[in-house]
Regions:
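Short beta-strand/loop segment that forms part of the nucleotide-sugar
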Residues: 35-44, 65-69, 94
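Short aromatic/hydrophobic "clamp" motif used to bind/position activated sugar donors
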Residues: 89
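Donor-binding/catalytic cores of nucleotide-activated saccharide
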Residues: 73, 94-195
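Cell-envelope/extracellular polymer assembly enzymes that use nucleotide-activated donors
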Residues: 5-8, 26, 37, 190
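Glycine-rich, basic loop-to-helix element that forms the pyrophosphate-binding segment
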Residues: 68-84
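A conserved acidic beta->alpha catalytic loop
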Residues: 26, 42-51
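Acidic helix N-cap motif at the loop->helix transition within catalytic regions
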Residues: 19-21, 47-56, 97, 101
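Short, well-formed alpha-helical segments that are part of the catalytic scaffolds
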Residues: 15-29
Length: 195
């Protein structure tokens, strides 16, 4: 693979044998696999998650990688970040999926990048979480960071999760941010430091 990786999708996978394939397949339908990589970070599963991941690697080749980490979603995401080669980072939970129509929005945004973080809409419920449409997207620049902070407080479910967003990798490293290893609220921490 000689192409520059544009997007690294990081999937923490703990006991995700039943959902991992759908998550990975949804990514392959929304991204040009020559410019994307999918990092499956298996972190202590007791089911057959590892076997599912190996089958996906056989199917998609070097664009899909299996990484092992200690237990914990934050450890898995950190391990994914260490191995990510993409300019942009997308965190996807193993039970999430991204709808195919979002490909247009994702590429349009990052190819014309005006920001370091893009927040998309998603749906929670019987249907898994997914990046939905462009209409709900809002841009925040330096002069409107205070507005975003207020919106984060008003709508924590939308803003305080790492999924449903695309992060420029350099901003994560610029602020020397790693997800807190044992904190179940690491989702809040990453966005607090970015803004």
């Amino acid at each position: 693979m000689n192409e520059k990786i544009l997007i690294s999708y990081i999937i923490p996978a703990y006991n995700a044998a039943d959902t991992l394939e759908r998550a990975v397949e949804s990514i392959t339908h929304t991204c040009n696999m020559e410019k994307c990589e999918i990092l499956i970070v298996e972190n202590g599963s007791t089911d057959y998650t590892n076997s599912v991941a190996l089958k996906l690697i056989q199917k998609y080749g070097e664009n899909v990688k299996l990484i092992h980490s200690e237990k914990g979603v934050s450890r898995a995401r950190n391990e994914g970040l260490k191995n990510a080669r993409g300019e942009w980072i997308v965190f996807v939970d193993a039970d999430d999926y991204i709808v195919s129509k979002s490909k247009k929005y994702i590429y349009e945004d990052i190819l014309n990048a005006k920001a370091d973080l893009y927040v998309y809409s998603y749906e929670i419920g019987n249907r898994a979480n997914y990046i939905n449409n462009k209409e709900e997207k809002t841009y925040y620049f330096n002069d409107s960071a205070e507005k975003m902070k207020l919106e984060m407080i008003a709508n924590p479910t939308k803003f305080m999760q790492v999924w449903g967003k695309i992060f420029r990798k350099s901003i994560i490293y610029k602020i020397e941010l790693a997800l807190i290893q044992k904190c179940s609220f690491q989702r809040i921490v990453i966005l607090h430091y970015i803004i």
